[in-house]
Amino acid sequence: MAGATVTVEEVRKAQRATGPATVLAIGTATPANCVHQADYPDYYFRITKSEHMTELKEKFKRMCDKSQIRKRYMHLTEEYLAENPNMCAYMAPSLDARQDIVVVEVPKLGKAAAQKAIKEWGQPKSKITHLVFCTTSGVDMPGADYQLTKMLGLRPSVNRLMMYQQGCFAGGTVLRVAKDLAENNRGARVLVVCSEITAVTFRGPSESHLDSMVGQALFGDGAAAVIVGADPDERVERPLFQLVSASQTILPDSEGAIDGHLREVGLTFHLLKDVPGLISKNIERSLEEAFKPLGITDYNSIFWVAHPGGPAILDQVEAKVGLKKERMRATRHVLSEYGNMSSACVLFILDEMRKRSAEDGQATTGEGFDWGVLFGFGPGLTVETVVLHSVPITTGATITA
């Protein structure tokens, strides 16, 4: 009986890609229903039958005015909410009604974003080897990953990973996971989808739970998809950003800063500490750990993609690091036009950045800069840090990092 003719090391080497994971395409989608922030306080207090809470409504108006959000998109229409009054109450059993929405609409919205990414990628969907699906909106078995696989007609053998209940940092998490998959599986093409719908968190106002109202003033619906792969075939694939490194950390003394709990009443949202202060206090350490090995200490010399959890977070990070206002332009644009879409936000920002960079005649997809950072902030308090390298817009070729 003949022995093996190859070693484990040879097999291992053959299994792995040569170059870094690269974002090859981006697609985004929102529900059709658009809500303008200036009109939202009146609408919100009317649909939840809370107009008698005049002082609370004034507080909510101030929250909306300070949010720096111009508009958001929401699957929940006035008609649907009128038919489901328990979803409009502050704490009424309503999980079944919420689940009925999200188990259908989360994969459907994800499909719309994925189809755009696949079209831009230009390769047959049969070449997708892995699917990473992320949502904080509901839980089901088989999951939204399974539903999307069926909807898109992906191969039954596609390797799926479903990530539920991660929260706002997860846009960084999915890129970190996709990087590992792409670099450790030669020829892999990873479809990453983040799809978020506020149907799980929508509820009426309460004097005793002002942090829930913060969420009502910020959250919007959206889905984003990216294709990630290493060693791109540049005859047909157009690299956008390289994923150079990725890490996750829990901030010290931050337990309970951001919590979400799935209950009969839906997903309840809690802000228990000074979240902007906690993030800005620790941001320099995350930047140093990520960029010191690269010899980068000037954080105005890199492009920025930061989860827009709210304007105060962005303001305090800018102040702490001494950032010029234009570094957060793409981030603030997405906050203004879509609100906080949880995990999908940073992928929307990448899309906005590469498009605006091309429109403005910049040399690279990263606003003319070579190196960049992507931050995700969320429950824990958890921070995801991804170091990115842009690609020249003129040639579309990758740069050796």
From Swiss-Prot:
One of its GO terms (biological process) is flavonoid biosynthetic process. It is an enzyme of class 2 (transferase). The active site is at C168. The keyword DNA repair does not apply. Its EC number is 2.3.1.74. Belongs to the thiolase-like superfamily. Chalcone/stilbene synthases family. This is Chalcone synthase 6. It comes from Sorghum bicolor. The lineage of its organism: Eukaryota, Viridiplantae, Streptophyta, Embryophyta, Tracheophyta.
